Structure formats: structure tokens, C-alpha cells
């Protein structure tokens, strides 16, 4: 297991953590060991995502860098966006979805690192996105004061909900029965079956990160040193604890066979691991901490296993979420503050698309160029067939002429 964190200083940190064998129960401790630093970006890191093989980072330099956790090498960069990368989400090990300040949401093949789909998702920035556990839906919010639902099977917009303010976080619950939308210091809890707000949670200060601990329990961090745990049904704060000496920038949670773990990163430079108790009203125990001496911005945990139960697709969702089909024409029908539509696929800008890299494998080419090459190959194949057919026809005609001459003789 490794804790990975990005910072303003353009570096990705990696720390391997191991449980101390003699400690257990409330005295359980883990030991962090510095494993790597990766300086690939030319501006501060803004987002990080992890699957079983790779860590990807987004930056204000408008690129997404890929780091191979197995080989501990740079695997290249994805260069399609024209703006700060604001959010990155893996769906299992096959797909990565990115959002940026250019308003685009891109779906990437996480094997070939090709851009499968590029959608103009918001009129302003894309500020956050979240993938439903089924892999068939995604939610996004942006600076155009909209909450958008995406059909990932067809690669198009399904619904648009107008909200009164710009939201900066959206997150599905583990089973996908509810989701939360964060605006400043308020959390609106939505039910999937009604698509309406069932309640609102208010935090002390602006919220920077949320993570579901269960279907109804949500951990919340903001522009303060405290982490709070809320019940999404009763909207009550179950507990709170001081996690850092400065504001908490990001949260990440996962389960081990023994207990639930929450990881926090702060602008004070510390990454900390906490063991949560079954009774969420009891404050968690600190498992380990490490000081990066940097201003941390984003956080992830690499679990070093083939399947992560929170991110791997269920058996019936193994098909790719989108294919390289033609964009559907816009067909909008407005009803109140909700719109159902088929979204046009955006045309990639003149800047860039696809992957460039210096890993052990050759860098994957521009996905658009690849498509052109495939088309050319198909066209050449067709021409070749037509030439062969013409030759065959000519030979048949010559044979028929010879037969006619023999008959006349």
C-alpha cells in the first residue's frame, strides 16, 4: 500500500506504509517509508487518481501524467485539455475520465491511453465529476451552475439540472442510491430514485473534500483543521476530530479486513492515516503520519491489488462505457430546471490529443491520427480488393474471348 499526494511544488510523493507486527487494537501503528518522488509537471498538481497499476496526476500545466506504480517509471502524458485539470476518476482498470477548466470531459482507454470520447460538458469549468458504481452513469458540476447526468454507455448527456450556485464537489455513495452536491460550506443530499434533495448538511467553513464511509455516513473536510462525520439520513454530525494544524485539503477512505481507514492530507505538509471505529461517534486512532514539507493539494491511495472493490466494475458492467461512435445531434426538451438532451461531441482543439511518453513502451499516438491511419488502411484495403477484382474480370473476359474464337473455328 502506498500513500500518494500532489503539491503546489509540482511533485508527486509516494510513501509505502506497513503495519507494525507487534502493535494491535488501539495500539496499532503503521510505518511510512519514502518510496518515490515524481516531478513531471511544470505547474502545481490539482488532481490525482489511482487504479491497480497506475497513478495519474492532473495539473495547472493542462496535462495528465501517468506513473507506473509497478515499475516506478513515468509512462507518458495525456495532452488533450486546454485548461487546468480539475478532476480525474478511474473506472476499474479500463477507463479514466478527466475534467478540466476548458469545460471538457474526456473518456480515456486506460490500456492504450487513447481518447475515446471528448464532450463539451459545461459552458464554464468542470469542477468535479463522479462515476456511478455501475459504470453506466456519471455526474458532473461546473461553473455554469448546472448539475449534469451523463450516459456513459452511449457517451452523451442525459439530464441537466440547474442549481442556484456553482457547485465544486459531487460524489456518489458506495451503492449509488444517493449522491451529494457541495456548494461552499453546504452539502445537498440527493436521492437517486427521486433526483431531489432529501436534506442539507452545513459545515463550519468551505468544504474542500468529502468521502463516503458507508451508504449513509459521510466524512467532510474543509478550510479548517477539523474532519467531521455526518449521517446523511438524520443530517446530524456524529463526531469530529482535529486532524491537522492547518486546513485539510483532501480525504481518501478505504476498508481493510480489520477496519475502515481514512487518510487526510493538509496544507501543513502532513499525510495522516486514521483507523475508524465501528461506532462513528468515537474519535479515530492515528495509525501513522508523514511530513512532506510541501503544500499538499491532492491525495490518493494505491492499494497494490488487482481489484479494488470500490472501483472495479461488476461482472455485468465489463463492456466499455463508450465507443468511438459519431456524436448524436442535440435534442433538448426543457422542463422546469431539468433538461434531457443528447450532447454533441466536441471537436478537439488544435492543441493536442492522445498520449506522449518515454516509458518502456512506445508512446501511444494521437488518437485522431490513429483513426485517420485506420481509415486510410481500410481505404487501401478496399482499393486493393477492387484491383484484384478488375484483374479477375479481365482474365475472365480473355478466357471468354478465346472460347468464342474456338467455337467459330
Predicted regions and their residues:
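Terminal intrinsically disordered, low-complexity extensions flanking WD-repeat/beta-propeller proteins
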Residues: 1, 11, 20-24, 44, ...
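Short loop/turn segments that connect beta-strands within beta-propeller blades
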Residues: 18, 69-72, 110-113, 152-155, ...
Amino acid at each position: 500500500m502506498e500513500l500518494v499526494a500532489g503539491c503546489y511544488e509540482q511533485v508527486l510523493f509516494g510513501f509505502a506504509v506497513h503495519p507494525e507486527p507487534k502493535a494491535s487494537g488501539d495500539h496499532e501503528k503503521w510505518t511510512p517509508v519514502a518510496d518515490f518522488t515524481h516531478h513531471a509537471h511544470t505547474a502545481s498538481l490539482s488532481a490525482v487518481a489511482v487504479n491497480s497499476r497506475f497513478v495519474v496526476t492532473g495539473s495547472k500545466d493542462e496535462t495528465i501524467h501517468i506513473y507506473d506504480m509497478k515499475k516506478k517509471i513515468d509512462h507518458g502524458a495525456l495532452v488533450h485539455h486546454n485548461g487546468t485539470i480539475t478532476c480525474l476518476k478511474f473506472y476499474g482498470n479500463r477507463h479514466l475520465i478527466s475534467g478540466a477548466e476548458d469545460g471538457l470531459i474526456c473518456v480515456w482507454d486506460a490500456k492504450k491511453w487513447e481518447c475515446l470520447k471528448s464532450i463539451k460538458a459545461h459552458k464554464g469549468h468542470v469542477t468535479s465529476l463522479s462515476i456511478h458504481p455501475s459504470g453506466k452513469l456519471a455526474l458532473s458540476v461546473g461553473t455554469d451552475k448546472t448539475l449534469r447526468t451523463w450516459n456513459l454507455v452511449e457517451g452523451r448527456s442525459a439530464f441537466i439540472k440547474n442549481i442556484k450556485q456553482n457547485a465544486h464537489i459531487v460524489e456518489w455513495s458506495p451503492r449509488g442510491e444517493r449522491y451529494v452536491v457541495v456548494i461552499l460550506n453546504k452539502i445537498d443530499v440527493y436521492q437517486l430514485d427521486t433526483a431531489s434533495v432529501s436534506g442539507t448538511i452545513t459545515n463550519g467553513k468551505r468544504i474542500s473534500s468529502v468521502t463516503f464511509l458507508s451508504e449513509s455516513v459521510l466524512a467532510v473536510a474543509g478550510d479548517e483543521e477539523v474532519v467531521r462525520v455526518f449521517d446523511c439520513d438524520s443530517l446530524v454530525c456524529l463526531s469530529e476530530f482535529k486532524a491537522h494544524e492547518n486546513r485539510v485539503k483532501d480525504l481518501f477512505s478505504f476498508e481493510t479486513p480489520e477496519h475502515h481507514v481514512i487518510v487526510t492530507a493538509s496544507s501543513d505538509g502532513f499525510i495522516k492515516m486514521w483507523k475508524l471505529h465501528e461506532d462513528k461517534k468515537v474519535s479515530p486512532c492515528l495509525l501513522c503520519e508523514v511530513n512532506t514539507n510541501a503544500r499538499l493539494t491532492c491525495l490518493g491511495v494505491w492499494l497494490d491489488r488487482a481489484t479494488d472493490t470500490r472501483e472495479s466494475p461488476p461482472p455485468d458492467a465489463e463492456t466499455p462505457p463508450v465507443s468511438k461512435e459519431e456524436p448524436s445531434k442535440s435534442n433538448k426538451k426543457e422542463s422546469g430546471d431539468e433538461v434531457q438532451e443528447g450532447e454533441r461531441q466536441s471537436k478537439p482543439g488544435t492543441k493536442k490529443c492522445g498520449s506522449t511518453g518515454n516509458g518502456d513502451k512506445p508512446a501511444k499516438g494521437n488518437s485522431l491520427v490513429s483513426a485517420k491511419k485506420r481509415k486510410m488502411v481500410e481505404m487501401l484495403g478496399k482499393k486493393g480488393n477492387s484491383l484484384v477484382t478488375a484483374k479477375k474480370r479481365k482474365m475472365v473476359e480473355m478466357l471468354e474471348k478465346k472460347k468464342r474464337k474456338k467455337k467459330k473455328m
